[in-house]
Amino acid sequence: MKAVYIIGTDTDVGKTLICAGLCWALKEKGYNIGYFKPVLSGAKRRGKMLIPQDTEFVVNFAKIKGDIYRLTPFIFEKPASPHIAASDENVDINVNQIKQTFEDLSQNYEFVIIEGCGGLAVPLKEERNQFYMQYQLIKEICNNVILVTTTKLGTINHTLLTVEFAKAYGLCLKGIIVNMYKNEPDEDKVINTITKFTNIPILAKVDFINDFPSDVDENKFKNVFKKCFDDRAIRKIMGVFEC
């Protein structure tokens, strides 16, 4: 089994959409793909049930087999940093449980895409005034990272800071996916600037989908992913799994 951890430069850069697209595109190419999101905050209620909506979307869109509550073992309603949401609900985010769940899931797939909760420096838990951070979990279960960014104002700073943080803490950041791409003149200038500073390959540029997540038109999504995750992009992405 091989895996890659999808992380973002910021909240709302579209990690879930990218994970769904990657899972779907790779399955279309015949790869046995699994999905895992260890921690999710900001879950929505449906009746009495708390739904990990990111996981539900990826599983339904990419037709991945698995119980959403197993694929996301820690779910919190409060839209906050996991260590705060967990503390408010008196829940211990058990890292060993996450590791074991990942190991169990890995037995069923050739490749697993792991979706992070926010960015690298997100605290997952606090115990005796000590923080356990997302980058620590990444290093322990899959030190193989793809960074999702955008071209919006401020993204150069966010992206470069994330890359430098990854280097400082020994993370294997293998590529960048640019999401919400609109093919506007300055966007490629932003992307070129990021590439010159980081020397990290751009794996794909994914077109902006203006009605996500309010209106899930699967055919529209699939057309975008067919274009953006073409054979060339897929070859680059599969190379990332080779850690």
UniProtKB/Swiss-Prot annotation:
Keywords: ATP-binding, Biotin biosynthesis, Cytoplasm, Ligase, Magnesium, Metal-binding, Nucleotide-binding
Reactions accelerated catalytically: (7R,8S)-7,8-diammoniononanoate + CO2 + ATP = (4R,5S)-dethiobiotin + ADP + phosphate + 3 H(+)
GO biological process entries: biotin biosynthetic process
Annotated compartments: Cytoplasm
InterPro entries to which the protein is assigned, alphabetical: DTB_synth_BioD, P-loop_NTPase
Class of the enzyme per the UniProt entry, highest EC level: ligase
Any single Gene Ontology cellular-component annotation: cytosol
Binding residue positions for ATP: D12, V13, G14, K15, T16, L17, D54, E115, G116, C117, G118, N179, M180
The protein's Enzyme Commission number: 6.3.3.3
Gene3D superfamilies, per database record: P-loop containing nucleotide triphosphate hydrolases
Keyword Cytoplasm carried by entry: yes
Active site per database record: K37
Signal peptide: none
Residues binding substrate: S41
Pathway where this protein functions: Cofactor biosynthesis; biotin biosynthesis; biotin from 7,8-diaminononanoate: step 1/2
GO molecular function, one term: magnesium ion binding
Subunit structure as annotated in this protein's UniProt entry: Homodimer.
Summary of the function given for this chain in its UniProt record: Catalyzes a mechanistically unusual reaction, the ATP-dependent insertion of CO2 between the N7 and N8 nitrogen atoms of 7,8-diaminopelargonic acid (DAPA, also called 7,8-diammoniononanoate) to form a ureido ring.
PANTHER family in the cross-refs: DETHIOBIOTIN SYNTHETASE
Family the entry assigns: Belongs to the dethiobiotin synthetase family.
NCBIfam families assigned: bioD (TIGR00347)
Designated name of the protein: ATP-dependent dethiobiotin synthetase BioD
Species in which this protein is naturally found: Caldicellulosiruptor saccharolyticus (strain ATCC 43494 / DSM 8903 / Tp8T 6331)
Protein's gene: bioD
